[in-house]
Amino acid sequence: MKFNELYIGVMSGTSMDGVDTALVEITDNHVRLIAHGDYPMPAAMKEMLLSVCTGQATNLKAIGELDHQLGHLFADAVLQLLNKSGYVAEQIRAIGNHGQTVFHQPTGDLPFTTQLGDANIIAVKTGIDTVADFRRKDMALGGQGAPLVPAFHKSIFAMQDSTTVVLNIGGIANISVLHPQQPVHGYDTGPGNMLMDAWCERHTGHGFDKDAQLALRGSVNEALLAHLLKEPYLAMSAPKSTGRELFNMDWLHHQLANYDVSVEDVQRTLCEYTAITIAHDVTKFTYGETPQLLVCGGGARNPLLMQRLAELLPQWHVTTTTDKGVDGDYMEAMAFAWLAQRHIHDLPSNLPEVTGASRLASLGVLYSKN
């Protein structure tokens, strides 16, 4: 089956730092990034989303209004990308929209996941068919509904004689393990930038620690680090996924309750926490003479975090997906464009060995522009 189509992927992740868009050309199984964009999220909307995500009191009216507002936000992000790139709606086969996760509960007696952003609004406002709601079919099949991006990584990074691990460091860190002789593995290792960003914003007013300036003024508090490493999630077996429901400021304040640590030392310790939890899991998959770790997401721009990963993984060649020709800042947006293409052509897009689903499935729901 031959394809040569244009798709747009839309992603707003756990960091809630804005909307990423990617216009891609998909030819057979090759994905080429044509254009990309960033669209800011209004501060008031982010504040409301954070309150919902962390379980603060809300109501259905507020959630419904957020769903509506996010639908327009995502549509406007797509329209901005089209205007910037010179393409028009009629040239785009479909949009793949992840939505904004406000709660993800993949385990227990009543597993569910909720993403906001009305795809009806996106389809009608842009004039482009939109695929959304990617996670719930996988969960209906007994899976975690996450991570979904390893299937995309498998399609674009050729298998090597040694292990390739694709590490996305967004709010949460997740890995895709491409082993030459074993099935793909993939799961959330734990916090990525989420705790560092939240701590930095709380104490400096900046949304993230640019160039690790705050962390570099501090030192690792070994006692606090040892305490953080006792988090039960870290010891859970895959498949597993996590999010802001666990790793949030309430969680961090609880961990800090018995420690008198400076702002700078907390930031440095949180950076070390992310690095160690990632390295611990990556090490499990060392295979071959030249295993490589390809980093994407916002964490790839944190020089201290990248330095510590290289130091903690001396056997590994640590670099970025950008260095391999795939822009790491738009990897997830590209992935959801690819997932939309898989849905349009009724192709499987989950990996049961990654999510725990009982079978392969074509994920997502189509929202027509008509």
UniProtKB/Swiss-Prot annotation:
The gene is anmK. It comes from Vibrio parahaemolyticus serotype O3:K6 (strain RIMD 2210633). This is Anhydro-N-acetylmuramic acid kinase. Keywords: ATP-binding, Carbohydrate metabolism, Kinase, Nucleotide-binding, Transferase. One of its GO terms (molecular function) is phosphotransferase activity, alcohol group as acceptor. Belongs to the anhydro-N-acetylmuramic acid kinase family. ATP binds at G13, T14, S15, M16, D17, G18, V19, D20. SUPFAM superfamilies: Actin-like ATPase domain. Pathway: Amino-sugar metabolism; 1,6-anhydro-N-acetylmuramate degradation; Cell wall biogenesis; peptidoglycan recycling. One of its GO terms (biological process) is 1,6-anhydro-N-acetyl-beta-muramic acid catabolic process. Catalyzes the specific phosphorylation of 1,6-anhydro-N-acetylmuramic acid (anhMurNAc) with the simultaneous cleavage of the 1,6-anhydro ring, generating MurNAc-6-P. Is required for the utilization of anhMurNAc either imported from the medium or derived from its own cell wall murein, and thus plays a role in cell wall recycling. It comes from the Bacteria. Pfam families: AnmK (PF03702). Its EC number is 2.7.1.170. HAMAP family: AnhMurNAc_kinase.
